[in-house]
From Swiss-Prot:
Keywords: Ribonucleoprotein, Ribosomal protein, RNA-binding, rRNA-binding. Binds together with bS18 to 16S ribosomal RNA. Belongs to the bacterial ribosomal protein bS6 family. GO terms for molecular function: rRNA binding. Signal peptide: none annotated. This is Small ribosomal subunit protein bS6. One of its GO terms (cellular component) is ribonucleoprotein complex. It comes from Geobacillus stearothermophilus (Bacillus stearothermophilus).
Amino acid sequence: MRKYEIMYIIRPDMD
């Protein structure tokens, strides 16, 4: 998993 993928899962509002 990539860093941005983890961030996206944690904060899906970060379109």
